[in-house]
């Protein structure tokens, strides 16, 4: 078969292009990382190292990752346990101890315009819409909203 589409498919394979599902998974892997990374560093005003060293905070970080992933899965994103565990591995072993987040820095300077809705509000609203339970995400979002109201 020498059809143009077959030839194009061969080019894509050689170039290691990803299909739409792969792209969606990659976007959500990055997103679920940020749902925990930005939210936890801002909520506690801690570096990643400080979060890692506190067993309660580390457990909360990982729970936020799983909660965000459950919303992605409910939306039909093909996130696997392996994808989710890779995000958790980055938290435990890859991110620099002194790493902070843009949301944390926004909260430190009491900036009115933040990424709170992007990394927390959206996931909470989508979970409600989809009937997915994410109690820790809801609790921390509410706490961050209360903090932001004082800016």
Say what each PLM segment does.
Residues 62-151:
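NAD(P)-dependent Rossmann-like dehydrogenase/reductase catalytic/cofactor-binding core
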């Amino acid at each position: 078969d020498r059809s143009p589409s077959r030839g194009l498919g061969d080019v894509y394979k050689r170039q290691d292009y990803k299909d739409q599902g792969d792209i969606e998974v990659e976007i959500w892997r990055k997103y679920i990382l940020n749902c925990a990374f930005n939210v936890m560093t801002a909520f506690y005003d801690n570096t990643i190292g400080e979060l890692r060293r506190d067993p309660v905070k580390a457990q909360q970080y990982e729970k936020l990752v799983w909660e965000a992933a459950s919303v992605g899965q409910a939306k039909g994103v093909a996130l696997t346990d392996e994808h989710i565990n890779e995000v958790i591995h980055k938290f435990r072993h890859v991110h620099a101890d002194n790493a902070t987040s843009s949301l944390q820095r926004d909260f430190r300077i009491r900036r009115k315009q933040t990424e709170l809705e992007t990394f927390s509000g959206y996931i909470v609203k989508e979970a409600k819409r989809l009937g997915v339970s994410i109690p820790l995400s809801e609790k921390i979002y509410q706490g961050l909203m209360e903090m932001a109201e004082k800016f």
